[in-house]
């Protein structure tokens, strides 16, 4: 009976207000995690609008520079490697690339397989967009020259790069995984 009384007292000490406060705290923490993830996936200005419930309309940027790159011989490397080796290789390489782009006024649009796409001049306009991308390309080439593929240490990694300057229309596409 004494155990039953202690149990009843504990139940009574947890007031509805305590429960509401705990749920509110959990909700705030979850909201914070969601916003942090959104800010990692999208440019800050776009993420801020979305978290404030403001729509993001497509916008024309008159002058931007886009960088594309892929890995020379990637398809044949994949055919001679295990899926885990390929994933580890791309993770190592693109983690290095992601570290490098932090030093430039650029936004990483996406990576698909061995393709890496970066832009300068949007969502924040800058007159130095072409110089930003050209300097980034040189830095990434230098990183590739020093990069060793852990499961193919005798292979030389080569990067194929394309850049283009001109007008761009940018917007948020999709709901499940906005881009």
Task: State what each model feature region is.
Residues 42, 142-145:
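Residues at helix-coil transition
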Residues 69, 100-132, 146-179:
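Catalytic core of nucleotidyl cyclases, primarily class III adenylyl/guanylyl cyclases
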Residues 1-112, 153-155:
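Juxtacatalytic helix/coil linker segments
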């Amino acid at each position: 009976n004494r155990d039953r009384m202690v149990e009843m007292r504990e139940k009574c000490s947890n007031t509805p207000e305590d429960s509401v406060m705990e749920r509110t705290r959990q909700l705030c923490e979850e909201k914070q995690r969601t916003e942090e993830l959104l800010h990692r996936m999208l440019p800050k200005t776009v993420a801020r609008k979305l978290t404030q419930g403001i729509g993001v309309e497509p916008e024309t940027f008159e002058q931007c520079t886009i960088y594309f790159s892929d890995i020379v011989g990637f398809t044949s490397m994949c055919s001679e490697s295990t899926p885990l080796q390929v994933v580890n290789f791309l993770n190592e390489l693109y983690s290095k690339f992601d570290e490098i782009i932090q030093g430039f006024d650029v936004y990483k649009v996406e990576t698909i397989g061995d393709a890496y796409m970066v832009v300068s001049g949007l969502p924040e306009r800058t007159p130095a967009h072409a110089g930003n991308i050209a300097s980034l390309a040189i830095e990434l080439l230098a990183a590739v020259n020093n990069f060793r593929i852990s499961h193919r240490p005798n292979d030389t990694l080569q990067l194929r790069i394309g850049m283009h300057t001109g007008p761009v229309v940018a917007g948020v596409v999709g709901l499940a995984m906005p881009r």
